[in-house]
Design a protein with these regions (language model features):
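Conserved active-site-adjacent core of cysteine acyl-enzyme catalytic domains
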Residues: 3-5, 9-10, 14-123, 131, ...
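Alpha-helical segment of the N-proximal tetratricopeptide repeat
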Residues: 133-176, 180-187
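Structural signature of tandem alpha-helical TPR/SEL1-like repeats
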Residues: 155-162, 187-199, 221-233, 257-265, ...
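Structural marker of alpha-solenoid helical repeat scaffolds
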Residues: 170, 203, 237-238, 272
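Terminal, low-structured helical/coil segments at or just beyond the last alpha-helical repeat
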Residues: 255, 260-289
């Protein structure tokens, strides 16, 4: 946890923060934020920028950002710990696994935009004066989004919807809030999902998860033409972000009698999902195509 940077070792099992949620391994992010705040930290969750990240680093603050994942991980958090002005690279650190990176600013920003450029800052309370006159975009609504995610994983679906409706009332241009809302409506098989996802991509045309959500929605509705269309749009934005999306598009393509396209997708699925539990079944299916 970034609190270690400030010399504070907070046990993850304190106050039950390490409890598991449905479909989530370990604690969710809002639990860690709440725990840090109980130990005297202040948090800010907002839409950032490359310039803002550099400003925080110059202030001695290591910001956390939400960026695309890879293979079976749809997204993850990374810490920006520095930057190289000559090479125009951002220096990043991911605690698990223990890895560092030096990512070109253009590439970093391109990927970061896919999730709304979310920035999380955790600082000791005696440093909050640094943010006194800051106008942080989506600060309140992003916090609500994180709280809604907790409710969602606790099974309180309608509580999460209520939270997210509040978030979009506060900030109608918050793409994260609209996409999360779309995700819940998608789980409920509600047509409201389409409305929310379309609002998301109108605000942010590069919002990968919204296009993927639309693909999932139409796949369930057996509208395979639209399912393939939206999965393809996701893949165009980032072809390496989430291996299982190729299997979903393969299903749609099979229904559209595009066997060659489905075969290509299943091969990519296995390449990009090294731990696929259905590898044997997929390999058998490939032999039939």
């Amino acid at each position: 946890m970034v609190t270690r940077y400030w010399g504070e070792e907070i046990p993850l099992d304190d106050e039950g923060a390490a409890k598991n949620y449905s479909g989530i391994k370990g604690p969710i992010m809002i639990e860690g934020i709440d725990l840090a705040e109980k130990h005297g930290f202040v948090s800010y969750i907002y839409e950032g920028s490359i310039r803002d990240l550099k400003k925080r680093v110059d202030q001695g603050i290591p910001p956390i950002v939400i960026v695309p994942g890879i293979h079976e991980t749809i997204q993850h958090a990374t810490i920006v710990c520095g930057y190289n002005p000559e090479e125009r690279r951002l220096l990043t650190y991911v605690p698990k696994p223990d890895t560092v990176g030096a990512i070109p600013e253009v590439k970093f920003e391109q990927d970061w935009k896919q999730d709304g450029m979310i920035t999380l800052v955790l600082i000791p309370k005696d440093m909050e004066y640094l943010f006194k006159n800051e106008n942080l975009k989506f600060k309140d609504s992003n916090r609500i989004c994180f709280e809604a995610e907790r409710l969602r994983h606790q099974g309180n679906i309608y509580g999460a919807i209520e939270k997210l409706r509040k978030a979009v009332e506060i900030d109608s241009e918050n793409s994260q809030a609209w996409c999360l809302l779309g995700g819940i409506y998608n789980e409920l098989n509600s047509e409201e999902a389409v409305i929310c996802y379309e609002k998301t991509v109108k605000i942010n045309p590069n919002y990968y998860l919204a296009y993927r959500g639309l693909g999932n929605y139409y796949l369930k509705k057996k509208d395979y033409t639209l399912a393939e269309l939206y999965y393809t749009r996701s893949i165009e934005i980032n072809p390496y972000r989430f291996g299982p999306i190729y299997k979903n598009r393969a299903v749609a393509r099979l229904q559209l009698n595009n066997n060659s396209g489905a075969k290509e997708d299943l091969i990519k699925y296995l390449e990009q999902t090294p731990n696929a539990g259905d590898r044997t079944n997929v390999e058998d299916a490939l032999e039939q195509l």
